[in-house]
């Protein structure tokens, strides 16, 4: 007997279960497992994947129309992902498939806008190969001269930031137009208003929003998983866990191409040395007369150190190197790993409860198969 199927988009992943937004079921997402044959061939399922789902028997599909009743998913019903369609793009951190653009959100103040942190996020976003939309929030808390200063400065970097205020909804329409009919990834440091912005862009979504820490003036991390949200005017938006220092997982020779202002200088001309790393070598096409040159040198040293960990100070001295908000490096001792720490009773109870809940879902899966 041929099983009823439908196609859809994976909007969330929880352990070995997947929430899928089906094309013909609009009332709620369907909780699914992954077919055993996909596991055997090592086929992973990611947020953003386009998939074919085998539907549970109790789920009846209706055609899309204004008069047809909205199909409902009975509580406890599980679908099964039978096929994952080829991906157009893949990101590992965060794990998202088929994303088309990255929307970087920063605050003009509270927390203060740090140029080194901003530059680092931009470089890592460039490394994904996706289109970048840069958004500056909290316009209502700064002077117009500050807005112009950062707008002109970012133009020299090769970007045209969208200035908004979530508080008074100023400029949000322009951002909505950029997100329309696309799968977009929202990222940025903590405390800049990403969760509040998603609440505004996606009416009804319940994102936890916490106040910015007054002591350190750094945002508390509020989002802990990747999830896709339906935008009212079409498109999907993924929020990602907040982080303050994204990794620079790039090759040294590739790094210079992640700076638009330097990339433009390399258009139509080449350096004298093919392995030039643009650190003052003779006849270098990039040169040193651009604002983020010091950023480039600092990031380059970090990338080179990652390729030669045996030569790093962390291995030899027990120190770890950190980069401050001004871009300067400093050392601090590494903490000893707690190898023999016992699990608390509370943690053991939580693990047992999680095991029991998963066992129930597995029984449902066996009944369905």
From Swiss-Prot:
Protein name in the entry: Small ribosomal subunit biogenesis GTPase RsgA
Cofactor: Zn(2+)
GO molecular function terms attached to this record: GTP binding; GTPase activity; metal ion binding; rRNA binding
Organism: Synechocystis sp. (strain ATCC 27184 / PCC 6803 / Kazusa)
Chain spans, region Disordered: 307-369
Gene Ontology terms: biological process: ribosomal small subunit biogenesis
Family of the protein in this entry: Belongs to the TRAFAC class YlqF/YawG GTPase family. RsgA subfamily.
Domain of life: Bacteria
Subunit structure: Monomer. Associates with 30S ribosomal subunit, binds 16S rRNA.
Residues involved in GTP binding: 137-140, 188-196
């Amino acid at each position: 007997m041929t099983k009823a199927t439908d196609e859809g988009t994976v909007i969330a992943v929880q352990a070995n279960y997947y929430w899928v937004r089906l094309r013909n079921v609009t009332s709620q997402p369907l909780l699914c497992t992954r077919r055993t044959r996909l596991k055997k061939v090592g086929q992973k399922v990611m947020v953003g994947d386009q998939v074919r789902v085998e539907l549970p028997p109790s789920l009846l599909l209706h055609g899309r129309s204004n008069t047809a009743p909205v199909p409902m998913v009975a509580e406890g019903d599980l679908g099964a992902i039978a096929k994952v369609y080829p991906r157009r793009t893949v990101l590992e951190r965060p794990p998202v498939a088929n994303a088309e653009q990255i929307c970087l959100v920063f605050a003009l103040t509270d927390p203060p806008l740090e140029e080194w942190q901003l530059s680092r996020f931009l470089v890592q976003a460039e490394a994904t190969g996706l289109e970048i939309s840069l958004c500056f929030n909290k316009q209502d808390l700064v002077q117009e001269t500050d807005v112009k200063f950062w707008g002109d400065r970012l133009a020299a970097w090769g970007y045209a930031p969208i200035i908004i205020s979530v508080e008074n909804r100023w400029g949000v329409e322009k951002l909505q137009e950029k997100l329309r009919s696309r799968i977009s990834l929202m990222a940025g440091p903590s405390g800049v208003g990403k969760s509040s912005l998603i609440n505004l862009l996606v009416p009804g979504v319940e994102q936890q929003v916490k106040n910015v820490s007054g002591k350190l003036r750094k945002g508390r991390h509020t989002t802990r998983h990747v999830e896709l949200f339906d935008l009212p005017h079409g498109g999907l938006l993924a929020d990602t866990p907040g982080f303050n220092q994204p990794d620079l997982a790039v090759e040294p020779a590739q790094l210079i191409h992640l700076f638009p202002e330097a990339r433009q200088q390399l258009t139509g001309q080449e350096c004298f040395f093919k392995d030039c790393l643009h650190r003052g070598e003779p006849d270098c096409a990039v040169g040193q007369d651009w604002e983020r040159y010091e950023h480039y040198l600092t990031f380059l040293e970090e990338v080179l150190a990652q390729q030669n960990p045996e030569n790093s100070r962390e291995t030899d001295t027990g120190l770890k190197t950190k980069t401050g908000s001004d871009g300067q490096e400093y050392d601090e001792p590494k903490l000893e790993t707690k190898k023999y720490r016992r699990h608390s009773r509370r943690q053991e109870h939580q693990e047992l409860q999680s095991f029991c809940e998963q066992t129930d879902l597995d029984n449902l899966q066996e009944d369905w198969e």
